[in-house]
Regions:
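N-terminal signal-anchor module of multipass membrane proteins
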Residues: 1-40
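Alpha-helical transmembrane segments
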Residues: 1, 49-54, 134-136
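Cytosolic juxtamembrane amphipathic/interface segments immediately preceding
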Residues: 7-14, 80-85, 115-122
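Long, contiguous internal "core" modules enriched in hydrophobic/ aromatic residues
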Residues: 17, 26, 42, 94, ...
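Membrane-interfacial helical/loop segments at transmembrane boundaries in membrane proteins
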Residues: 1-2, 73-77, 224
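Membrane helical hairpin/interfacial module
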Residues: 27-95, 102
Length: 231
C-alpha cells in the first residue's frame, strides 16, 4: 500500500501565515451558520454559507505541501480505500469536502438548478435534511478549533478550550450575518426576529469562553513564559 502522507505533507502550523485567519472565519461562519439555518431555512443565507464553506476548503487545502500531488492522492486513496484518519488534515478535508459538496447541492435546490420540483423543495425544508447539515456544520467548526490545538510552540493555541471558543465565535458571526442580511432585505425579517435577543446571550457566552481560554492558557508558568516571549 502506498504511503500517501509523503505526497502532500501538511505545512507546520507556525508557517501557515495570515490565510489561516480567513480559513477559521469562513469555516466558523459556514459551519455554525448551517446550525442556525436549521431554524431559519433562508435560501440567500444558504448561498452565503456555501461560498464560505468552499472558500474555507480551498484555504485549508492550500496549506498542504506539494499541492500538485493532491489529485494523485485522491485517486489512490479512493482506489485502495486507504484514508489516513489519524491525520487532522485528512479528517478536516473530508469534513469540509462533505460540507462543501452538500452545500452546493443545497444551493442548487434553492436556486432550482437541475433539482427542480416540489419534492426537492420539500426535501430542503425537511427537518432531517437540515439536521444533517446542522451536525456536519458543528463538526466542521469543532475541527477547525482542534486543528489549532495541534500547533506546537505557538502561544495560546494549544488549549483545550479553543474548540469551544470557535463554536461561540461561529455562532456570533452567523447571527451577525443574518442581522446584516435582514437589514439589507435579503432574508425574511420575521424569520430572524429572534436574532437580536439571541445575540446578546451568545456574545455573553463568547466573552465567558474568551476569559476562560485566557485563564487556562496563563494558568501555568510555562504558559505565562510563552506569552511573555510573544510580547
Amino acid at each position: 500500500m502506498i504511503d500517501l502522507s509523503t505526497l502532500t505533507p501538511q505545512l507546520q502550523a507556525t508557517h501557515w501565515g495570515w490565510t489561516i485567519a480567513l480559513f477559521l472565519w469562513f469555516i466558523g461562519l459556514s459551519g455554525m451558520g448551517f446550525f442556525i439555518n436549521y431554524w431559519v431555512r433562508q435560501k440567500n443565507f444558504v448561498y452565503v454559507l456555501t461560498f464560505c464553506g468552499i472558500a474555507g476548503l480551498a484555504l485549508v487545502t492550500s496549506h498542504l505541501g506539494r499541492l500538485s500531488n493532491l489529485p494523485f492522492v485522491i485517486f489512490y486513496a479512493l482506489r485502495d480505500f486507504s484514508f489516513n484518519f489519524q491525520s487532522w488534515m485528512m479528517i478536516g478535508i473530508v469534513l469540509l469536502s462533505l460540507l462543501s459538496v452538500g452545500s452546493v447541492f443545497y444551493s442548487m435546490i434553492c436556486a432550482g438548478i437541475i433539482f427542480k420540483g416540489s419534492k426537492w423543495q420539500k426535501l430542503a425544508q425537511s427537518n432531517g435534511f437540515n439536521a444533517v447539515f446542522s451536525v456536519l456544520g458543528v463538526c466542521s467548526t469543532i475541527y477547525s478549533g482542534f486543528l489549532l490545538t495541534q500547533a506546537v510552540g505557538v502561544s495560546l493555541w494549544n488549549s483545550s478550550l479553543i474548540p469551544v471558543l470557535w463554536i461561540m465565535s461561529g455562532l456570533t458571526s452567523s447571527i451577525a450575518m443574518l442581522e446584516l442580511m435582514s437589514a439589507m432585505g435579503l432574508v425574511d425579517h420575521k424569520s430572524v426576529g429572534w436574532c437580536s435577543r439571541t445575540s446578546v446571550w451568545v456574545d455573553t457566552a463568547k466573552l465567558f469562553a474568551i476569559f476562560s481560554f485566557v485563564y487556562v492558557a496563563l494558568g501555568s508558568e510555562i504558559g505565562r513564559a510563552s506569552c511573555r516571549e510573544r510580547v
